[in-house]
From Swiss-Prot:
GO terms for biological process: translation. This is Large ribosomal subunit protein bL12. Forms part of the ribosomal stalk which helps the ribosome interact with GTP-bound translation factors. Is thus essential for accurate translation. It holds the Pfam family Ribosomal_L12_N. Homodimer. Part of the ribosomal stalk of the 50S ribosomal subunit. Forms a multimeric L10(L12)X complex, where L10 forms an elongated spine to which 2 to 4 L12 dimers bind in a sequential fashion. Binds GTP-bound translation factors. InterPro entries: Ribosomal_bL12, Ribosomal_bL12_C, Ribosomal_bL12_C/ClpS-like, Ribosomal_bL12_oligo, Ribosomal_bL12_oligo_N_sf. CDD domains: Ribosomal_L7_L12. GO terms for cellular component: cytosolic large ribosomal subunit. Keywords: Ribonucleoprotein, Ribosomal protein. The gene is rplL. GO terms for molecular function: mRNA binding; structural constituent of ribosome. Belongs to the bacterial ribosomal protein bL12 family.
Length: 125
């Protein structure tokens, strides 16, 4: 029972990017399709984990608030920043959320600048 509780806590603590990677692994290796509401639940759990990073102020999370009118350019930038595939980057841009987490201020500002230049609304948390 303790193992299941630890597994559940690990899943709830995933960032949006980690949840996307988990979804891909489950789909490709095990043939498990995600439920329709899964992304919304994981995004809420990812925000809870971001609270600890805010207290430190040495690490920042880059959060995509809105892709803006030129979503294709934003998807291209997200792919370049994260190394995700086209489909995963598109899903991340459409859902919004953390693009990168736990980065130093200089890198976070650089990523924010690139995404804003592509037309996105970005916030550092």
């Amino acid at each position: 029972m303790a193992d299941l509780k630890a597994l559940a806590e690990s899943i709830v603590g995933l960032t949006l990017l980690e949840a996307q990677e988990l979804k891909t692994i489950l789909k490709d290796e095990y043939g498990i399709e995600p439920a329709a509401g899964g992304a919304v639940m994981v995004a809420a759990g990812g925000d809870a984990a971001g609270g600890a990073a805010e207290e430190e102020k040495t690490e920042f999370d880059v959060v995509l608030k809105n892709a803006g009118a030129s979503k294709i350019n934003v998807i291209k930038e997200v792919r370049g920043i994260t190394g995700l595939g086209l489909k995963e980057a598109k899903e991340l841009v459409e859902a919004g959320g953390k693009i990168k987490e736990g980065v130093d201020k200089a890198e976070a500002e650089d990523i924010k600048g690139k995404l804003e230049a592509a037309g996105a609304e970005v916030e550092l948390a």
